[in-house]
């Protein structure tokens, strides 16, 4: 509050369920996580994926106590994908990009996330920030990020909010 800000769009990525190849348990939604034959591997408190899981469960009216494996925590997308691949869990949540690294799982889309950078106006106008934004907006940089796979770089570097009159 009281601080002039600029929000710069960076990229989007897809989040979804990691399930065993062929989705043998036919997991389609968060509602399925309350089934007694489904076990999830969760992410650590404070992670973006954990926030997503908790919010989706809340929206569905599913108490965390009703989700088998909710207390079983891993610390990365790859650990979650590997747990599903090994059969230690039926489902996990993570980014599409990381699912591509584990051939024994399938990815089921849940939502797209937007990654944005918030910059104070006083910093936005400084030369180092302007140079960083120039790099972010360059086709070379965007091609490199897109080449990593799993990221949508459309509108990268675009100002999506400004309460200070700053222009793209």
Question: What are these model-derived regions, one by one?
Answer:
Residues 1-23:
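N-terminal segment of the mature folded domain
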Residues 19-40:
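Flexible hinge/capping segments at coil-to-helix
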Residues 81-111:
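A ligand-binding cleft/hinge motif common to bilobed small-molecule-binding domains
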Residues 43-55, 139-168:
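Ligand-binding clefts/hinges and TM-proximal coupling segments of bilobed small-molecule sensing domains
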Residues 62-88:
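A mid-sequence, solvent-exposed acidic-amphipathic segment
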Residues 33, 53, 81-85:
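Hydrophobic residues within well-ordered alpha-helices
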Residues 14, 102-134, 155-160:
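Periplasmic-binding protein-like
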Residues 31, 45, 49-72:
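Ligand-binding cleft/hinge of the Venus flytrap
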């Amino acid at each position: 509050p009281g601080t002039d800000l600029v929000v710069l769009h960076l990229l989007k990525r897809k989040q979804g369920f990691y399930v065993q190849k062929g989705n043998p348990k036919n997991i389609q939604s968060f509602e399925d996580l309350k089934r007694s034959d489904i076990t999830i591997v969760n992410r650590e408190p404070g992670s973006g994926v954990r926030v997503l899981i908790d919010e989706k469960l809340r929206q569905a009216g599913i108490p965390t106590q009703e989700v088998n494996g909710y207390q079983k925590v891993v610390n990365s997308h790859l650990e979650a994908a590997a747990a599903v691949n090994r059969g230690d869990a039926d489902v996990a949540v993570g980014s599409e990009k990381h699912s591509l690294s584990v051939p024994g799982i399938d990815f089921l889309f849940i939502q797209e996330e937007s990654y944005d950078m918030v910059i104070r106006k006083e910093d936005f106008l400084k030369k180092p920030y302007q140079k960083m934004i120039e790099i972010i907006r360059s086709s070379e940089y965007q091609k490199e990020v897109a080449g990593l796979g799993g990221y949508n770089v459309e509108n990268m570097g675009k100002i999506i909010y400004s309460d200070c009159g700053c222009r793209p």
